[in-house]
Amino acid sequence: MSEATYQRKGRTLVGIVVSDKNDKTIVVRVETLVKHPLLKKYVRRRKKFTAHDPMNECGIGDKVKIIEFRPLSRNKRWHLESILEKAV
């Protein structure tokens, strides 16, 4: 299990893997806190990103870091950078 590191410019996001059913592809749910303009309270926003997992090493529930990458398919524009925490 060798870790490939990609030092590229672009955004990095941290999220939880919610699906790993496709080959070499994971779906990562990223949560952000955004201040509501009218209510002035923080609201949790969730968004799903499809990322490339070249060695199929992620499982559901893993906390991962993904990095912006060139388009690999219609929806895949992110690449797995590292696994921060494995699920139990």
From Swiss-Prot:
Source organism (scientific name): Nitratidesulfovibrio vulgaris (strain ATCC 29579 / DSM 644 / CCUG 34227 / NCIMB 8303 / VKM B-1760 / Hildenborough)
Gene: rpsQ
InterPro entries the UniProt entry points to: NA-bd_OB-fold (IPR012340), Ribosomal_uS17 (IPR000266), Ribosomal_uS17_bact/chlr (IPR019984), Ribosomal_uS17_CS (IPR019979)
Database matches in CDD domains: Ribosomal_uS17
GO biological process: translation
Self-association and partners: Part of the 30S ribosomal subunit.
Xref: Gene3D superfamilies: Nucleic acid-binding proteins
HAMAP family linked: Ribosomal_uS17_B (MF_01345_B)
SUPFAM superfamilies: Nucleic acid-binding proteins
PANTHER family, alphabetized: 40S RIBOSOMAL PROTEIN S11 FAMILY MEMBER, SMALL RIBOSOMAL SUBUNIT PROTEIN US17M
Function summary: One of the primary rRNA binding proteins, it binds specifically to the 5'-end of 16S ribosomal RNA.
GO cellular component, one term: cytosolic small ribosomal subunit
Keyword annotations of the record: Ribonucleoprotein, Ribosomal protein, RNA-binding, rRNA-binding
Name of the protein: Small ribosomal subunit protein uS17
